């Protein structure tokens, strides 16, 4: 049914005609997400008519059908202005049961009305900054948090619980003030951790499910997404003992999520959200990933249960096969594995054995091949600086932050970016709590070590001498041509001569020489100022 015909029916005011027109429109457009520009003005007119009645108050018999029509039109950005008034948003919040102005004992809720209202609010908040601001001002997060906290006692159906969480996710993703309010005033981490525990069936006395059902999977992922939003900067925050205990408890739930299978084909998606949130936890709280006791069937390494680390490594390898959005898919799991390896020697040695086994193939460049090491070395020269940084950091930590060992496995050319950023171009080792474990060399590596090109990280055939057969005069002529070419490039600032500063960082040759001379003068006791 055309929007003009529906609008005409609404203007008649005859209830039977109005409801029949709206039912037909809803039925025909329930799956419409794009709209014809030619009918834009008709849809705007229809939206205004729907909103005017919504703001005055809908009789119970009309609410579901009316809200369904509003939900469909709220997908159309050209109609948003009609729906984003303070009165219309307040009306939707009241029908959803999340208005702060409602009394402590609100009227009984019709769950179909609640669900349609929540869907309308989600559409509006997603698409309209005005709706986002009005929702924040109205304090919808307070009632949403109350409902999430009552999920065990409430008789709300799955769809309502899910869209409560979806609206909470959108508000915390799009509004900093709502994020802070949920985190600080409403104790969002504690509240949502408890909700996650209940959703996963992890409470005392309950048998832990081996396969998470579809509805619980959907709700768990929404909870993880909201937790990610409100803990986004907690990794940078100092936490006291009470908060650390809470984050460790959350970490145990995330560990369970990583080990859990989800119904259908959503296991990797669930694991992805859990890994993203693990990356937000304070580093000292990640020790819970390695506190599972070894048991029959578990992977034990140096007396430690490595099941979680193995799953995370397998998850990372799957993500490496993706060719798009590597930053979102690979960086979080690499960061988590890096911190586990940095803090825990058994985890580092296990990961090194899997990722950087003793070198045998010394004739292939480190970035060539389909081994996990090859894939990670390729990421070290990725266009995205965050991707190459986390990949290099992970391999560097697996090498116990030893520069020679890092160069051995990756080649100096691939390693140069991280070494320059760390001020380690001159070698050395940063401060770190690493044991002096030996890096066992294979016989193949020992035999070829002297012939390995440190820049490429492989044995290369000796190239022919380009000056072979030239006279001394010809050699001198070619050398001067080369000098003149470099001089021209330098004078036109196409290239800049670089040197190594005393701190091990690349800098201009002139600055490097000045710093070196200043260092020598300051360390010479016989030197006096002029």
Swiss-Prot record:
* Record PTM text: Phosphorylated at Ser-435 and Thr-440 by CK2, stabilizing its interface with G alpha proteins.
InterPro entries tied to this protein: ARM-like, ARM-type_fold, Chaperone_Ric-8_A/B, Gua_nucleotide_exch_fac_Ric8
The biological process GO terms on file are: G protein-coupled receptor signaling pathway
Pfam family for this entry, one: Ric8
Could you tell me where this protein is found in the cell?
Cytoplasm, Cell cortex; Cytoplasm
| Key words, A-Z | Chaperone, Cytoplasm, Guanine-nucleotide releasing factor, Phosphoprotein
Q: Which coarse location class describes where this protein primarily resides?
A: cytoplasm
In UniProt terms, what function does this protein have?
Chaperone that specifically binds and folds nascent G alpha proteins prior to G protein heterotrimer formation, promoting their stability and activity: folds GNAI1, GNAO1, GNA13 and GNAQ. Does not fold G(s) G-alpha proteins GNAS nor GNAL. Also acts as a guanine nucleotide exchange factor (GEF) for G alpha proteins by stimulating exchange of bound GDP for free GTP.
Partners and quaternary state?
Interacts with GDP-bound G alpha proteins GNAI1, GNAO1 and GNAQ, and with GNA13 with lower affinity. Does not interact with G-alpha proteins when they are in complex with subunits beta and gamma. Interacts (via C-terminus) with RGS14; the interaction stimulates the dissociation of the complex between RGS14 and the active GTP-bound form of GNAI1. Interacts with NCS1; interaction is favored in the absence of Ca(2+) and myristoylation of NCS1 is not required.
The protein in question is named Chaperone Ric-8A
């Amino acid at each position: 049914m055309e929007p003009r015909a529906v609008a005409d029916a609404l203007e008649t005011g005859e209830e039977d005609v109005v409801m029949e027109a709206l039912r037909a429109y809803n039925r025909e457009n329930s799956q419409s997400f794009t709209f014809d520009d030619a009918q834009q003005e008709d849809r705007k007119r229809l939206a205004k008519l729907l909103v005017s009645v919504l703001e005055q108050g809908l009789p119970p018999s009309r609410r579901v059908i009316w809200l369904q029509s509003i939900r469909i039109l709220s997908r159309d950005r050209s109609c948003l202005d009609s729906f984003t008034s303070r009165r219309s948003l307040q009306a939707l919040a009241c029908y959803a049961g999340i208005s702060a102005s409602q009394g402590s004992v609100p009227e009984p809720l019709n769950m179909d009305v609640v669900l349609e209202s929540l869907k309308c609010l989600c559409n509006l908040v997603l698409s309209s900054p005005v709706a986002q601001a009005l929702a924040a001002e109205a304090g919808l997060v307070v009632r949403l948090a109350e409902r999430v906290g009552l999920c065990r006692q409430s008789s709300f159906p799955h769809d309502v619980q899910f869209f409560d969480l979806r609206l909470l996710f959108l508000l915390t993703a799009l509004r900093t003030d709502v994020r802070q309010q949920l985190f600080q005033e409403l104790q969002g981490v504690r509240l949502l951790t408890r909700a996650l525990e209940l959703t996963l069936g992890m409470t005392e006395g309950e048998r832990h499910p081996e396969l998470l059902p579809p509805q619980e999977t959907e709700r768990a992922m929404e909870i993880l997404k909201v937790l990610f939003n409100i803990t986004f900067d907690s990794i940078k925050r100092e936490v006291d003992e009470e908060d650390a205990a809470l984050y460790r408890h959350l970490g145990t739930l995330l560990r369970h999520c990583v080990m859990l299978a989800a119904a259908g084909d959503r296991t990797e998606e669930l694991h992805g959200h859990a890994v993203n949130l693990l990356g937000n936890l304070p580093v000292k709280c990640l020790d819970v990933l390695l506190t599972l006791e070894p048991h029959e069937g578990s992977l034990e390494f140096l007396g430690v249960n490595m099941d979680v680390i193995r799953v995370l490594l397998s998850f990372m390898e799957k993500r490496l096969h993706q060719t798009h959005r590597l930053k979102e898919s690979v960086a979080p799991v690499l960061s988590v594995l890096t911190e586990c390896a940095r803090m825990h020697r058994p985890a580092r040695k296990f990961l090194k054995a899997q990722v950087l086994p003793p070198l045998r193939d010394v004739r292939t460049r480190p970035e060539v091949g389909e081994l996990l090491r090859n894939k990670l070395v390729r990421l070290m020269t990725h266009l995205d600086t965050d991707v190459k940084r986390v990949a290099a950091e992970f391999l560097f930590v697996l090498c116990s932050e030893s520069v020679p060992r890092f160069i051995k496995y990756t080649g100096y050319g691939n390693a140069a970016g991280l070494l320059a950023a760390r001020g380690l171009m001159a070698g050395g080792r940063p401060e770190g709590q690493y044991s002096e474990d030996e890096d066992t060399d294979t016989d193949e590596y020992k035999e070829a070590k002297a012939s390995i090109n440190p820049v490429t990280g492989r044995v290369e055939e000796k190239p022919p001498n380009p000056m072979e057969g030239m006279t001394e005069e010809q050699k001198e002529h070619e050398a001067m041509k080369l000098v003149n070419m470099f001089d021209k490039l330098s004078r036109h600032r196409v290239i800049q001569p670089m040197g190594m500063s005393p701190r091990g960082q690349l800098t201009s040759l002139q600055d490097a020489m000045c710093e070196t001379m200043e260092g020598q003068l300051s360390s010479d006791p016989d030197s006096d100022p002029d």
